[in-house]
Amino acid sequence: MKYAGLLWVILAFTGTAFAQNLPSQFVISGETARKIHDFTTINLATAERIAETCERLAQKEGVAISIYILDNDGNHVYMHRMDGQGYLNIVTAEMKARTALMGREPSKSRMNRVIQNPDVELQQIQLGLFPNSGGLPIIVNDQMIGAVGVGGSAPRVAQGWSDEICAHKAMTEVLGPQPPLLEDLPPRAVSNRGNQPVPRFELPQGVTPRSSLPSEFVVSGKAAANIFDGNQISSEAAKKIARTCRAWAAEHGGAASIYIIDTHETFVHQERGDGQVYTNIHTAMLKAQTALQTRQPTSIRAAQLRNDPSGQPRQLMQFGFFTNSGGIPIVVDGEMIGAIGVGGGAGGGGDENCAIEGLKAAFGNRVLLPVYPQQKD
C-alpha cells in the first residue's frame, strides 16, 4: 500500500510537470485534465481555432475543404466539412490526420516514400496509413497534443496552396511558428499509361438542385451541384446547432460530445467537449446514426424498451440501433436534412434537451421536435 501511494504521488507530480510545460490555452487543464488523467491533449477551443482558420483560408482561396482534428488518443475533437464536399473529401481528411498521429510525422513523409519506392505503398495501406499530404502532428513545446488532417482541395503548391499548406498556416496562426514543411517530390511517371477516355459527369453550367428550404439551412448553389443534392444540412446551420448545444451544456455545468450528419450518414460537423472520453464521443455518433436510420428520436426506442424490454435483442443485435436518448433526425418544414446525436450528459441537463436547444436556435419553430404526453396524476 505504501508503494501504491508513492506511485500516485509520482504520477500526480508527472501530470503537474506536463501541465507546467504546456500552455493551458492549448490543452485540457486543471480539474478537467485530472479527471481524465491527461494534461497533454488538445482542447476544443484550440482545435476549433485551427479548423476555423483553415476554413477562412480556404474561403479566401475560393475552395472548399474538410478538416479533422484528433486528440493524442485518436479521438475526434473537432470535425467540419464545408458545403459541397463529398464522402471521399471527408474520409481522406480523417485518414491524413490519423496517419500523422500514428507516424508522429507529416503524412507527406509517407507519400514521399511511396513516390521514391512504389513497392512500399501496399505495406503502408496494410498498416492503416494513408500516404498522401495534408496531415500534420500538432506539437507544442515538443509534446504532441493531437493531429490535423485536411482534404478536399486540389493542390497548387507553386501558387502557395494545398491541404497541407492550409493546415500549416492555420497552426502557425494559432500556435506560433511551425517546423518547415517537407519537400514536395515530383510524382513518379506512370509506365504503360493507357489511353482510355474518361467521361465527365457534372450538371450543365447554372443548373443546381432545388430545395424549398432557405439557403442558410441547406447546401445550395454550386456546392449543391457538386453533390447533386439540395437537401443536405448546411455547414453553417450545423455549426449553429453545435455551438448552441455546447453553450447550453456549459450553462448546466458540463460538456457534450456532438455529431451532426447529413442524410447520407456523412459527417458534417463534430466536436468533443473538454473532459469527454471515448464512450461519450462514440455514443453521440451512434445516436445520430440511429436517429437517421429510424427517422425517429432515439428517445422513442429508449422509452419503448423500458416499457417492454423483450424487444432489446432485436433492436440492439439484429438492427444495430443505439437506444439511449440524445439522437434526433433533423426535419425542417417536413424535410429531413440530417440528424444530430449528443452524448456525455450535457452537464446533467440531458443529451436530448441539449440537441433540442441547438435545433431551435438554428431553425426556430420550423424544426420538428419530440413532444412528450402530459403525465396523468
Segments from the language model and where they lie:
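Flexible, solvent-exposed loop/hinge segments and secondary-structure transition points
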Residues: 20-377
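Positively charged n-region of N-terminal signal peptides that target proteins for export
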Residues: 1-5
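Sec/Tat signal peptide C-region and signal peptidase I cleavage site
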Residues: 15-19
